[in-house]
C-alpha cells in the first residue's frame, strides 16, 4: 500500500495545489485575448485567492508542448496538480468543490436567481450583431433591450437579505454591487465578461449604448470596473473590437 507522506511537515490537504490556467492570446500572440470563458476561469481563480500561473495561447501557432499537453483542445483549460481539465462548467464545479472554506472563499451565489440573471443577453446580442439586413435591425435591437431591461430590474430589486422585516423603512431599490450581493460570485464571473463584450462591440459596430436609464446595469458595471479581479483579467477594448471585426455584419440593403 502506497503512503502519502507529508512534505516539509505539511499535511497533504495543507499543500498549495499546482494550478496553471491556459487562456486565449490576443492578436499580438501574447496579451489576453477576447474570450469570456477564459476570463470566467481567470476571475474564479483570482477570487479564490489561490496561487496559480497563467499562460496565453496563440491559436495561430500552438506550441508543440501544448499540443502534447492537451491535444485538440482550445483554451481555456487548466492543469491542476498536472491533471488536465478542459470543460469550463466542470472546471468551475471542480474548483468550487476542492478550493473550499475555510482556506478558500465559497463563490456559489446564495440566491438561485442570480445564476440565471442575464442569461439570454449574449444570444440576443449575437443575433443583433451578426445581422446584415437593415429591416431586421430594429426588432433585433428591441430583443436585446428587453433582455437588458430584465437584468436591470433584477439588479434594482432588493434581495431578501437587503430587506429588514423589523424596519419601518420600505426598501424599493437595491444598492448591492453585484448580482448576489456586495461580493462577486460565480454568477458574476459568468455574466460580466459577456456583458462587457456587449457594451464594447454594440457601441463600435452599431453605435448602440446601454441606456443610461438602466441604472442597475450601470451600477453593476461601474462596480466591476473598480475591481482588479475583473479589470486585470479583461482583454482591452481594442482586442474585443478586433475579435468581432469579421463577426459583426454591416447593415447593407
Swiss-Prot record:
What keywords were assigned to this record?
Acetylation, Cell junction, Cell membrane, Chloride, Chloride channel, Cytoplasm, Cytoplasmic vesicle, Cytoskeleton, Ion channel, Ion transport, Membrane, Mitochondrion, Nucleus, Oxidoreductase, Phosphoprotein, Transmembrane, Transmembrane helix, Transport, Voltage-gated channel
Gene Ontology CC: anchoring junction; centrosome; chloride channel complex; cytoplasmic vesicle membrane; mitochondrion; nucleus; plasma membrane
What positions are modified (Phosphotyrosine)? Answer: 244
The reply to whether Acetylation figures as a keyword in the UniProt entry is yes
Annotated stretches, region: Required for insertion into the membrane? 2-101
Database matches in Pfam families = CLIC-like_N, GST_C_2
Show where the GST C-terminal domain sits: 81-244
The subcellular localization recorded is:
Cytoplasm, Cytoskeleton, Microtubule organizing center, Centrosome; Cytoplasmic vesicle membrane; Nucleus; Cell membrane
Q: What does this protein do?
A: In the soluble state, catalyzes glutaredoxin-like thiol disulfide exchange reactions with reduced glutathione as electron donor. Can insert into membranes and form voltage-dependent multi-ion conductive channels. Membrane insertion seems to be redox-regulated and may occur only under oxidizing conditions. Has alternate cellular functions like a potential role in angiogenesis or in maintaining apical-basolateral membrane polarity during mitosis and cytokinesis. Could also promote endothelial cell proliferation and regulate endothelial morphogenesis (tubulogenesis).
> What's the family?
Belongs to the chloride channel CLIC family.
Quaternary organization: Monomer. Interacts with HRH3.
Name recorded for this polypeptide: Chloride intracellular channel protein 4
Gene designation per UniProt: CLIC4
Amino acid at each position: 500500500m502506497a503512503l502519502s507522506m507529508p512534505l516539509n511537515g505539511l499535511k497533504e490537504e495543507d499543500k498549495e495545489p499546482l494550478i496553471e490556467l491556459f487562456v486565449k492570446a490576443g492578436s499580438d500572440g501574447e496579451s489576453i485575448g477576447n474570450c469570456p470563458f477564459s476570463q470566467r476561469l481567470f476571475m474564479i481563480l483570482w477570487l479564490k485567492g489561490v496561487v496559480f500561473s497563467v499562460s496565453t495561447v496563440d491559436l495561430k501557432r500552438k506550441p508543440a508542448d501544448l499540443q502534447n499537453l492537451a491535444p485538440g483542445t482550445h483554451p481555456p483549460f487548466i492543469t491542476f496538480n498536472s491533471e488536465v481539465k478542459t470543460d469550463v462548467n466542470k472546471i468551475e464545479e471542480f474548483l468550487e468543490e476542492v478550493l473550499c472554506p475555510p482556506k478558500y472563499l465559497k463563490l456559489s451565489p446564495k440566491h438561485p436567481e442570480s445564476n440565471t440573471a442575464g442569461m439570454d443577453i449574449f444570444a440576443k446580442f449575437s443575433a443583433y450583431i451578426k445581422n446584415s439586413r437593415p429591416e431586421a435591425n430594429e426588432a433585433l435591437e428591441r430583443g436585446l433591450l428587453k433582455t437588458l431591461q430584465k437584468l436591470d430590474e433584477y439588479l434594482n430589486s432588493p434581495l431578501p437579505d437587503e430587506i429588514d422585516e423589523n424596519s419601518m423603512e420600505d426598501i424599493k431599490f437595491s444598492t448591492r454591487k453585484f448580482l448576489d450581493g456586495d461580493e462577486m460570485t460565480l454568477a458574476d464571473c459568468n455574466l460580466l465578461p459577456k456583458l462587457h463584450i456587449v457594451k464594447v462591440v454594440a457601441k463600435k459596430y452599431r453605435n448602440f449604448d446601454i441606456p443610461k436609464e438602466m441604472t442597475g446595469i450601470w451600477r453593476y458595471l461601474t462596480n466591476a470596473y473598480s475591481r482588479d479581479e475583473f479589470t486585470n483579467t479583461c482583454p482591452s477594448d481594442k482586442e474585443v473590437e478586433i475579435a468581432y471585426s469579421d463577426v459583426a455584419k454591416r447593415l447593407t440593403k
